[in-house]
Design a protein with these regions (language model features):
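The feature captures the beta-strand-to-loop junction immediately N-terminal to the Walker
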Residues: 29-31
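Conserved ABC transporter NBD signature motif
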Residues: 52-62
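Conserved ABC ATPase "signature" region
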Residues: 90, 94, 101-119, 171
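Helix-to-loop junction immediately C-terminal to a conserved catalytic motif
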Residues: 44
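Short coil-to-helix segment of the ABC ATPase nucleotide-binding domain corresponding to the Q-loop/switch region
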Residues: 83-90
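Catalytic Walker B motif of ABC-type/P-loop ATPase nucleotide-binding domains
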Residues: 148-151
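Conserved signature/switch motifs of ABC ATPase nucleotide-binding domains
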Residues: 122-125, 143
């Protein structure tokens, strides 16, 4: 992936090759400027690669987008302040002309799933940052995607809220059984969430390591104190230092 800036060419991603299995939870991990968000945007058909091939459930990113194969959650919740929580969740279903009764049924199910069943009539500005991101996750799941793409969704939250939402996200993932591709620059977050961690290095962005995470599931906060958890963090950190 290349682009031009101020008269010079920048190589954002170079010879990146990876494969994610159905139902797998993987993280794209790396420092700022390593191309992890660019890679996610290519998967989401928000940016076009200058070379190479990308397949989403056997389809091109554009075909996957048009057939509602994936949902996406950004760093910012991107909610509409003039729409209620429930109306924000039903928005993609309205765009698909799903009948109102079905829209409401799905929204009610998702509100319960993300723990916001009592907040359906609230507005985004009445919610905390963590609650807003839960609404964004519910909206992404409204179309029942096979794949959930997440671009550092918890990076703006405090550490306590972030760790709690990590655990809640895994509970949601267990129920929906979608494939998740999660972008983060936090090593502990990647280890806690993932089946595998794809480590990207910068200048140009490239895949430098793939680390299996053999921690048992379900994962709980107590695992953050486990020696194996710290060993995996150290292993990944050593991979960065070796780049």
């Amino acid at each position: 992936m290349r682009y031009r800036t101020e008269g010079s060419e920048v190589v954002a991603l170079h010879q990146v090759s990876l494969e994610v299995g159905a139902g797998e939870f993987v993280s794209l991990l790396g420092p700022s400027g390593c191309g992890k968000t660019t890679l996610l945007r290519i998967m989401a058909d928000l940016q076009q690669p200058t070379s190479g091939v990308v397949k989403i459930a056997g389809k091109s990113p554009k075909e996957a987008r048009l057939s509602q194969k994936y949902g996406i959650v950004f760093q910012s919740p991107v909610l509409y302040d003039w729409r209620t929580v429930k109306a924000n969740i039903t928005l993609p279903l309205e765009m698909m002309s799903i009948p109102k009764a079905e829209r409401n049924r799905r929204a009610d199910e998702l509100l319960e799933l993300v723990g916001l069943g009592n907040f359906s009539d609230r507005y985004p500005w009445q919610l905390s940052g963590g609650m807003q991101q839960r609404v964004a996750i519910a909206r992404a799941l409204a179309i029942r995607p096979e794949i959930l793409l997440m671009d550092e969704p918890f990076s703006a939250l405090d550490e306590f809220t972030r760790e709690r939402l990590n655990e809640e996200l895994l509970a949601i993932w267990k129920q929906i059984q979608s494939t998740v591709v999660f972008v983060t620059h936090s090593i502990p977050e990647a280890v806690f969430l993932s089946d595998r961690v794809f480590v990207l290095s910068p200048h140009p962005g490239r895949l430098s390591a793939v680390v299996d995470i053999p921690l048992p599931r379900p994962r709980t906060q107590s695992m953050r104190n486990d020696p194996e958890f710290f060993r995996l963090i150290t292993e990944i950190r050593d991979r960065f230092e070796g780049v």
